[in-house]
């Protein structure tokens, strides 16, 4: 049984994830024998999921095996009681916790490469699983031989080796291992694919499961192209303000993308800049219909912390302002520099004293101001519409009133002509 050893070098510290199953024990055996000169140091990691009674026996066996072969071994016992008590599927949670521990240990050990015993049959099973559960469009179809994770590399040296070859190798060298009885239970989807569906396909002489590997190659090439296109789009069209937790993209440019690329763009933005959202394709498609509608302004709640705001020609992803405190009313008795919400107000000393005290507040229904250079008044709300001001900006913008409660300034959009040079309003942080 030949390993693909291109994923590590002779001066590397390699770490092997060993479950005591036939695959990982055969991998470990090869590393201790035919490939013993291919690395500098070898360490084993074992996870006791604490679900099966045989787990304790497996851990003891591996301790004795590693001691006999002078291998450093680290064991982690997971607590999955929360999922068991709630009747949740433990497979996904176990995988997440397992790799969190791998992350921790690879850092502690200062190791270079983590080896796993995924083989060819695992690859075919994973491809089929992702196709039929609808997760093929936004992920690679199966495993990569080499992948990067949190400062280290994961390598799968058995990915071209079939389960049949592994079994023949085990029988030839009498390699000890444990059989996980739960692998025979077809109530688990992956087991059903492995034990029932794939063998049924292989029985048909006109069908070959191995053709899935060609599909994976083609699919993954298209996936990489989409990822590249998404990064190019983000670089060209997305403006990101990390301090304000705010990003902005042209609504038209986004709407012009094909739906497949829209999904990848949003996946990149939501996972890279914020929390790891898990948005379904169906939800995305509903959003895309709203984005392309003629409605000028609306919002979509992502979570209790994040929101998508559509404002005229802009698509904005931002943190909700629920936790922030904003001024609603402020009184100014004398000239000076003041902050109102996210605006800076400079009140000059030349402003006539008869206008004081000034009232600074946010908008109210029915607000109007006198037009400059002609008769008549205009509604503040109409000014906002004409200037395409987003709803959340309208809610914070300062409106300045004189002593007689006449509006003399509306943010950075309007100042009464007679006092324009004496009241300067700008967004806080603008030069």
UniProtKB/Swiss-Prot annotation:
Its main location: cytoplasm. Its EC number is 6.3.4.19. GO terms for biological process: tRNA modification. It is found in: Cytoplasm. Belongs to the tRNA(Ile)-lysidine synthase family. The lineage of its organism: Bacteria, Bacillati, Bacillota, Bacilli, Bacillales. ATP binds at residues 19-24. GO terms for cellular component: cytoplasm. InterPro entries: Lysidine-tRNA-synth_C, Rossmann-like_a/b/a_fold, TilS/TtcA_N, tRNA_Ile_lys_synt, tRNA_Ile_lys_synt_N. Ligates lysine onto the cytidine present at position 34 of the AUA codon-specific tRNA(Ile) that contains the anticodon CAU, in an ATP-dependent manner. Cytidine is converted to lysidine, thus changing the amino acid specificity of the tRNA from methionine to isoleucine. Pfam families: ATP_bind_3, TilS_C. It comes from the Bacteria. The gene is tilS. The keyword Amino-acid biosynthesis does not apply. SUPFAM superfamilies: Adenine nucleotide alpha hydrolases-like (SSF52402), PheT/TilS domain (SSF56037). The keyword Zinc does not apply. The N-terminal region contains the highly conserved SGGXDS motif, predicted to be a P-loop motif involved in ATP binding. This is tRNA(Ile)-lysidine synthase. It catalyses: cytidine(34) in tRNA(Ile2) + L-lysine + ATP = lysidine(34) in tRNA(Ile2) + AMP + diphosphate + H(+). One of its GO terms (molecular function) is ATP binding.
